[in-house]
């Protein structure tokens, strides 16, 4: 969910929900390489002359639901439904063994990684297989196929979480 930084109450009633705005905002989201506020705000969304500096607990992209779009499976992010989606790559789901969070590839301009919302991660976790003990899962059962998880992509991502539990 997207909030103003100084919002006192951060819940669904106080977040931005207008899908056209979310599309505009997230399509301009990038790593902050402006030399301004980089340590406090590692992401930026340039909206015309306005600079929106962004910080987040974990990743700026949070996948909120799994959908079908034009006969293709996609993950939607930012609670924007069909407006903001990326192709679903089930073989690239990654569960971090340190915190149990599930991640999926995102656009390179935001660091290449997005967090899977807890509710969706719980649904997906039913399909994980752990052949290496309690470490990250090694396989994923999806649509009748047993997929070997490919987690190498995580090594090439950038995350700047503000929450210590997410590091």
UniProtKB/Swiss-Prot annotation:
One of its GO terms (cellular component) is mitochondrion. It comes from the Eukaryota. One of its GO terms (biological process) is wound healing. InterPro entries: DUF4505. Belongs to the UPF0598 family. This is UPF0598 protein CG30010. It comes from Drosophila melanogaster. The lineage of its organism: Eukaryota, Metazoa, Ecdysozoa, Arthropoda, Hexapoda.
């Amino acid at each position: 969910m997207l909030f103003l930084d100084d919002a006192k109450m951060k819940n669904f009633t106080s977040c931005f929900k207008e899908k056209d705005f979310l599309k505009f905002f997230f399509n301009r989201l990038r790593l902050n390489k402006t030399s301004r506020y980089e340590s406090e705000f590692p992401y930026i969304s340039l909206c015309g002359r306005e600079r929106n500096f962004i910080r987040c607990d974990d990743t700026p992209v949070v996948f909120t639901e799994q959908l079908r779009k034009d006969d293709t499976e996609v993950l939607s992010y930012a609670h924007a439904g069909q407006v903001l989606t990326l192709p679903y790559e089930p073989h690239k789901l990654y569960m971090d063994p340190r915190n149990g969070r599930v991640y999926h590839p995102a656009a390179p301009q935001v660091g290449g990684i997005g967090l899977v919302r807890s509710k969706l991660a719980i649904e997906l976790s039913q399909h994980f297989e752990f052949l290496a003990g309690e470490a990250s899962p090694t396989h994923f059962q999806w649509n009748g196929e047993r997929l070997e998880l490919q987690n190498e992509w995580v090594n090439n991502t950038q995350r700047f979480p503000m929450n210590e539990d997410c590091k």
